[in-house]
Amino acid sequence: MQTVFSFLLAALLHEGGHYAAWLFGGGKKNNGGASFRFGYAGAELRVPPSGSYRAALAVQLAGPAANLLTALVTLFFPGDFPRLLREQSLLLGGLQMLPIRGLDGGGALEATAALLWGERAAYRLPAVTSWLCLTALWLLSCCLLLLGSGNLSFFVLSFWLLCRQVRR
């Protein structure tokens, strides 16, 4: 039960980081667009576009930053729950920073590419990095399964993310 609760708390803190950055960047709580939900893929916060690539970049990076901050704070607390929360936070924040469309890293890459090279690069670069990362993750999960040292959940996650990319 502690594992489930620690993951839910890590996800809430992650999404809270996004929300705080959105509010700090000028977003309004009641502007008719911010919504939070738990879905089959985890927690999701939807906020209206800010109109600024810098603000979008800050919002994208704020979730993983909240996970990193959570992990650092839990270093000072003994026990199983802080350790679980630290591990879950680092896992969630690290996974979200992969440069894959639909994850925070993909959104951050898109905003950065738009700032540096324009709209065309903002569309193309995340598409390429998504395919490269997802293919590498899926191949790694297949190899680990075949060698007997992998786990099925990593294979399912990488396959699910790859299928999501195919649908885009």
Model-predicted segments: where are they?
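Small-residue-rich helix-interface/hinge motifs
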Residues: 2-56, 87-88, 98
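Core segments of transmembrane alpha-helices
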Residues: 62-73, 129-139
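Active-site-flanking alpha-helical
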Residues: 17-26, 70, 74, 111-113
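Hydrophobic core segments of alpha-helical transmembrane domains in multi-pass membrane proteins
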Residues: 3-11, 83-94, 147-163
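Hydrophobic alpha-helical transmembrane segments
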Residues: 1, 73-79, 139-147
